[in-house]
Regions:
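A solvent-exposed, acidic/Ser-Thr-rich amphipathic alpha-helical stretch
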Residues: 22-78
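Hydrophobic alpha-helical core bundles mediating ligand binding, dimerization, or RNAP-core interactions
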Residues: 10-17, 29, 53, 57, ...
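A beta-strand edge to alpha-helix "cap/lid" segment located at domain peripheries
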Residues: 57-157
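Short, low-complexity N-terminal intrinsically disordered segments enriched in polar/charged residues
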Residues: 1-27, 31, 147-157
Length: 157
């Protein structure tokens, strides 16, 4: 896969995420892929990834928009900066619009995504929603646990 082909993959990847079509979104992944989402946690395999997109993302928000910028690709893994936005449908935050930026890491195998990770400042999204400080602290502790338990973090420390 070339850098241009990677950029094209990202374009279709984000359009399929915006559409909410779980199977279409999951078709970008290998059968055993893992999608590490900062809100919903890890999802493994196409069926679970499709469920996450269609039944979690699009249950909790509408008006999704996701764009990737400045993609780089070395033949095995790629990175891109992104902006994403949505409008919450969660009752206590209904109608509130959120916009966040993030960095995405893609490990590819045979032209498909084998692993996806993202790094975003979810606190910005929670502030835009009006999430209370106690709930934010609880979520931040969960995210801290995810980071500290990752094999890469353990090896690093």
């Amino acid at each position: 896969m070339t850098g241009d082909e990677f950029a094209s993959l990202l374009g279709d990847f984000t359009l399929s995420a915006e559409s909410g079509a779980g199977a279409r979104f999951a078709s970008h992944f290998t059968e055993d892929a893992v999608y590490h989402d900062y809100i919903y946690g890890p999802h493994q395999g196409r069926a679970d990834i499709a469920h996450m997109m269609q039944n979690l993302f699009h249950r909790d928000a509408t008006d999704y928009r996701w764009e990737m910028f400045d993609p780089v690709f070395d033949g095995r893994q790629g990175y891109a900066w992104s902006l994403s936005s949505c409008t919450s449908t969660i009752p206590q935050f209904k109608g509130r619009r959120v916009v966040i930026d993030g960095m995405s890491r893609f490990v590819l195998r045979d032209g498909l995504i084998a692993e996806y990770r993202e790094s975003v400042n979810g606190g910005v999204a929670m502030a835009q929603l009006g999430v209370g400080p106690e709930r934010m602290a609880k979520v931040f502790k969960r995210w801290t646990g995810w980071l500290e338990r990752r094999p890469e973090t353990i090896d690093y420390l």
